[in-house]
A protein has these predicted regions:
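Signature of soluble extracytoplasmic/periplasmic domains of secreted precursors
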Residues: 1-171
Length: 171
């Protein structure tokens, strides 16, 4: 599993995250890689979760493509089977707090009700809450030409899903 998350933080900033399902050994591999790159690797702990920085600029974009270019600073941690990458320790701490406090989509009743209409098996899922008015983010800049922001501001949930079968995509 691989995901890209863009949130509109209460600070007014857009925070971007890349989430990759992985085993805990991935942290050890990344830490070892860091030791070979820099003499002073970044290391911190927040609420019992170790935070690191991978000192390879734009590594996610280079490995995964331009969709992941918004995460370029590569601060990361491992939580419940997932590597989480973002641009700052503050953003990562916010993610950790939300996860530990269960303030995520998995625990959101509106999202749970909405996902009853979404297949649990898909290759690509885009989910957005346009009513949050986060239309200034990089993701939405490309959509402004064909989307009336006022109309979309009244929509609480929007999803687009792609699934493959026999080398064909279905939505």
């Amino acid at each position: 599993e691989l995901g890209y998350i863009s949130t509109f933080a209460s600070s007014g900033n857009t925070e971007n995250y890349v989430v990759i399902q992985s085993k805990s050994e991935a942290i050890d591999m990344l830490r070892h890689l860091n030791k070979n790159i820099t003499e002073n690797p970044y290391n911190d702990t927040h609420r019992g979760v170790e935070i690191y920085k991978l000192h390879i600029p734009d590594v996610l974009q280079r490995v995964l493509g331009n969709l992941f270019s918004a995460v370029y600073e590569n601060y990361f941690c491992w939580i419940n089977g997932y590597l989480i990458f973002t641009n700052s320790p503050t953003a990562l701490k916010t993610f950790i707090n939300s996860n530990l406090s269960r303030k995520t989509l998995a625990y959101n009743i509106y999202y749970q009700n909405y996902t009853e209409n979404i297949s649990s098996k898909c290759n690509y899922l885009f989910y957005s809450n346009p009513s949050l008015n986060n239309w200034t983010s990089d993701l939405y800049k490309n959509l402004k030409d064909w989307v009336n922001v006022e109309d979309w501001s009244n929509i609480n949930a929007f999803a687009f899903q792609l699934t493959t079968n026999n080398e064909l995509f279905y939505n």
